Amino acid sequence: MGSNSSKISDLPKNEYLKKLSGPESISENDPFWNQLFSFSFPAPTSSSELKLLEEATISVCKSLVENNPRTGNLAALTKVFLSRTRELRLSAECQNHIFIWQTHNALFIICCLLKVFIRELSEEELQLHFTYEEKSPGSYSSDSEDLLEELLCSLVQLITDTPLLDITYEIAVEAISAMVVFLSCQLFHKEVLRQSISHKYLMQGPCLPYTSKLVKTLLYNFIRQEKPPPPGTHVFPQQSDGGGLLYGLASGVATGLWTVFTLGGAGSKAAASPELTSPLANQSLLLLLVLVNLTDAPDIPNPYRQAVSSFKNTQDSSPFPSSIPHTFQINFNSLYTALCEQQTSDQATLLLYTLLHQNSNVRTYVLARTDMENLVLPILEILYHVEERNSHHVYMALIILLILTEDDGFNRSIHEVILRNITWYSERVLTEISLGSLLILVVIRTIQYNMTRTRDKYLHTNCLAALANMSAQFRSLHQYAAQRIISLFSLLSKKHNKVLEQATQSLRGPLSSSDVPLPDYAQDLSVIEEVIRMMLEIINSCLTNSLHHNPNLVYALLYKRDLFEQFRTHPSFQDIMQNIDLVISFFSSRLLQAGAELSVERVLEIIKQGVVALPKDRLKKFPELKFKYVEEEQPEEFFIPYVWSLVYNSAVGLYWNPQDIQLFAMDSD
């Protein structure tokens, strides 16, 4: 091709690619492969460059699909790569830059081709292209070696066994990307795939023994957040005279195949977004989430989920039960630190949810931490900026809070952690507040946001469940948190009255002659009354279990006591209103006895004195409020599209045409 190519769109005319995809068979020992693999470029990462690369690859693939049944060149390319991977570890130890660089380039080419093949071909056709036999040109045999499976196992071994050095960083990222590409057939199906070659290869056969090692490696990649090496340390720098070892390796190397990618150096500027400091960590986390969320194969549970559900702390010396497969140990302190630091991304929040929900060892460890604020504050910040987040990220953050609030120790300890100057909380200056009070404020704000915008019942339910779990352990509530609890009840009360009025008017008014259906006011009323009932139960739970710890809540209750009047005789709320009514009456009479024109400080003093005198036996006992998160049936219908949307939006150096995506709606968040 020479040095004239300057655009990715020229790739289909490239002589090396034309030969690879052409009608001539190329032997595995042909010097051609060294020429093909000897390119150096800043890998394209901007969507425009990646789109151009995809379009250019399609053209090459069309020719390859047509000719490969006769040439077997795809199999030859794969075998050359496989032979190189067997020497990769030794090459890394010997600092054999050239060998690693060429092996990376071979994998890059395979990955580009495989991505198009997976989209364009059926699984059967894909397998046929990888099962060519030289003995009988032009024919395929089911008895021949399964190169596709061998390729996948080779990628797994490359990820787990190759030491991570400056010179191996890029090939490690590329191997993980290639595995993501291998599993990407899910993107092109509306339905969740329950049987595929990926299930077959990854859940049985030679890949299976590497399960725990792969999961552990991907987790440690996430934990370590290794940054890519500085430019020039992983690829040979260009010699000033155009000579040197690199350029003497094969004819036309320096001005050959892939110089098109330099685009005058612009390619290097289109790096990952500034917040993505570790492509390896990002790609590892995405692959891990894809693997963990694969559906179980028939009669074979997902081994990657088993591994994630059972690993233990390196400091835990107790033996693993023999019945648990794919076990390993990892440093929980390092994992916890990484989880705390990385919660700005959807994928890190999803990993935290997965570990808390599925791994009891991790959950126990997290709940025992004395620096819980390091984990909870980033989660609260996600919820606080709800309008900037997608709904899935908000759900994950809320469910994490719900799981944490299932633990009484957590609910007690968060009120003992005092925070100062929460800069991201802008509604009010909070110079000093407990973590528990801040959590209440943020959850209530989320409910109010949901009431005015999305009106999502599922979101309401999770918010209220978390507050309910905490309510018996409310301690020393900040005055603003106490006010917001009552303010939320006020908002719900107004909404209830408005819906009730609309329902009454619709019954009185004439029947609508238009085709527009009337709103279901009965349904709306039922939902709002359910939420009001829940709020009353939360207030009641606090009053009956920790009244003496919360004078600010009693103060807020008395200040807005008129709000509760309409619910005293309401059949849906009569029982739960008894205690609230008793507390309001008891303290109201004490304030009346103290006279008028009382200061805030004096009112609080009267409340604190009255708490001691209030006869506790007069408060009716209710069952303790306890809600537990239970994953819905067929959770894969939610999680698999979500995970792949994260891959689509966040994977480094991977582009798919949005028009080809079937799994999720491209216009959704």
From Swiss-Prot:
A GO cellular component entry from the record: Golgi apparatus
The UniProt entry, under Pfam families, shows:
Dymeclin
Q: How is it modified after translation?
A: Myristoylated in vitro; myristoylation is not essential for protein targeting to Golgi compartment.
Disulfide bonds listed in the record: none
Q: Which InterPro entries match?
A: ARM-type_fold, Dymeclin
Name the membrane topology term: Lipid-anchor
Which cellular compartments is it found in?
A: Cytoplasm; Golgi apparatus; Membrane
Q: Which UniProt keywords apply?
A: Cytoplasm, Golgi apparatus, Lipoprotein, Membrane, Myristate
- What superkingdom heads the lineage? Eukaryota
Lipid-modified sites (N-myristoyl glycine): G2
The processes (GO biological process) annotated in the record are: bone development; Golgi organization
Q: What does this protein do?
A: Necessary for correct organization of Golgi apparatus. Involved in bone development.
Q: How does it assemble?
A: Interacts with GOLM1 and PPIB.
Which family is this sequence assigned to? Answer: Belongs to the dymeclin family.
Q: What is this protein called?
A: Dymeclin
Species name: Mus musculus
